[in-house]
Every structure is written in C-alpha cells, then in structure tokens.
C-alpha cells in the first residue's frame, strides 16, 4: 500500500501540493487534472524521485525520505517521453543497465532481458539502435526496462500522449495486462474508464476521489 501523510510540496515559494492525506490500495489508479495542478509532481513523490517539504510518503511501510534505493526497486516509473529513459544506444544494453547497476547475475540479466523483449515483440531489435525505434516501440522498451526490475508498483506519466492511435492502443493493452499495481497520470479519459479509482487534482489538492464513472464526468464538468 502507498500512504501519503500530510504531504506538502513546493518549488521555492510556490506551493504545488497541499496537505495531502491518501491511502492507495487499488490495483488500477488514475490521476487526472488540468496542466500545472500538481499531478506529475505527486507521481514523482510516490517513488522517491522527489521528497516532500512536509509530511511523509510510505511504500509498504518504507519512507521515501530514508529508503530511497529500496523504494525505487519496488516502484517503477515510466516517463511521458521514453527518450528520457534511454541510457545506452543499443536496445539490449539499455534494458540490462538497471540490473547491472543493482548487481544482478549475468544469467538473470540475460533471462529477464530476453523475456522482456519477447513480451512486446522487440526481440528482433535487441542489437538495434534504441533511438531508431518507433514511438510506440520506445514506450514498450521503457515499460520493459521497468518490468525487468520486477517492481510491485509501476507509475506511468502520460504514457500515450505522444503516440498515434495504433501505438496508443498497443501501449494501453500492455499496461492493461500488467500484474503489478498501476498508477497512471493521463489526459486520455477513455483509457482510464476501466480503472478502479480516479483522483482528480486541482490547485494542488485532490478535489474528487471516486470510481471512473463518477470521477471522470465530474472532471469534465469542472473543465467546462
């Protein structure tokens, strides 16, 4: 479970998130809201990429202030632009990087890399320059890079925003088939209809917290 206890976050004097208190237990959670409302900042707090000014974020009881490395193994993060997650130019090397960094054995690295590439039909590109992949393939590579670490939670920041319709469907299907707890920041409301819970952010606060059939129409009314 993810717990947010009286969390406030600010950039300098500008308060981005205000006194948030939440428990996130559901398997599929969506975060929506207008640009600048604090949703992406909130997502980064959940895996320790950012640390709150006040309050605490707990992941299965571990505090992001003191257990950052352990939490980043438990909570994977897929960025909006998959180019931001490409570390090495060759696909196979890029997938192996995180595991090598954490001391995984060569056999484990080889096995998990092959499984991840096979899952999304990327095996033929294992020695391919990563930057030459299509947008959809890059996003699937980014998802693979998180999956090889075997996290318990995966956070996606606008995973379909930069993709055409065909690749949006492909990436959405990949996310839908994940066994991990998934938290998605998105403007793609159709994609979120099957989720368990939707948090609507406005001005640094959660103003709606409900199932999609209630939260999404309320958000649409707010935007009118």
Curated annotation (Swiss-Prot):
Cited InterPro entries: AAA+_ATPase, ABC_transporter-like_ATP-bd, ABC_transporter-like_CS, ABC_transpr_CbiO/EcfA_su, ECF_ABC_transporter_ATP-bd, P-loop_NTPase
Documented EC number(s): 7.-.-.-
Binding residues annotated for ATP, in chain numbering: 33-40
Molecular function via GO: ATP binding; ATP hydrolysis activity; ATPase-coupled transmembrane transporter activity
Keywords carried by this UniProt record: ATP-binding, Cell inner membrane, Cell membrane, Membrane, Nucleotide-binding, Translocase, Transport
Subcellular localization(s) per the UniProt record: Cell inner membrane
Keyword Isomerase: no
GO cellular component: ATP-binding cassette (ABC) transporter complex
Segment forming the signal sequence: none
Domain ABC transporter: 2-224
Origin superkingdom: Bacteria
Disulfide bonds: none
Entry membrane topology: Peripheral membrane protein
PANTHER family: ENERGY-COUPLING FACTOR TRANSPORTER ATP-BINDING PROTEIN ECFA1, HEAVY METAL TRANSPORTER
Similarity remark: Belongs to the ABC transporter superfamily.
Function: Probably part of an ABC transporter complex. Responsible for energy coupling to the transport system.
Record-given protein name: Putative ABC transporter ATP-binding protein plu3849
Organism: Photorhabdus laumondii subsp. laumondii (strain DSM 15139 / CIP 105565 / TT01)
């Amino acid at each position: 479970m993810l717990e947010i206890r009286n969390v406030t976050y600010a950039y300098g004097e500008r308060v981005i998130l205000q006194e948030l208190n939440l428990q996130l237990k559901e398997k599929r959670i969506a975060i929506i809201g207008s640009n600048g409302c604090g949703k992406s900042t909130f997502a980064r707090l959940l895996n320790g990429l950012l640390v709150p000014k006040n309050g605490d974020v707990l992941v299965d009881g571990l505090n992001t202030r003191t257990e950052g490395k352990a939490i980043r193994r438990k909570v994977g993060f897929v960025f909006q632009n998959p180019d931001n997650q490409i570390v090495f130019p060759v696909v196979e090397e890029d997938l192996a990087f995180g595991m090598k960094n954490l001391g995984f054995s060569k056999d484990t690295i080889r096995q998990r890399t092959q499984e991840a590439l096979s899952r999304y039909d990327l095996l033929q590109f294992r020695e391919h320059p990563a930057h030459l992949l299509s947008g959809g393939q890059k996003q699937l590579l980014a998802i693979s890079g998180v999956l090889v670490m075997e996290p318990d939670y995966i956070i996606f920041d606008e995973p379909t925003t930069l993709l055409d319709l065909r690749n949006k469907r492909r990436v959405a299907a990949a996310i839908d088939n994940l066994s991990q707890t998934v938290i998605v920041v998105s403007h793609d409301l159709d994609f979120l209809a099957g989720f368990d819970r939707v948090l609507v952010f406005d001005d640094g606060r959660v103003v709606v917290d409900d199932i999609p059939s209630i939260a999404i129409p309320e958000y649409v009314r707010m935007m009118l």
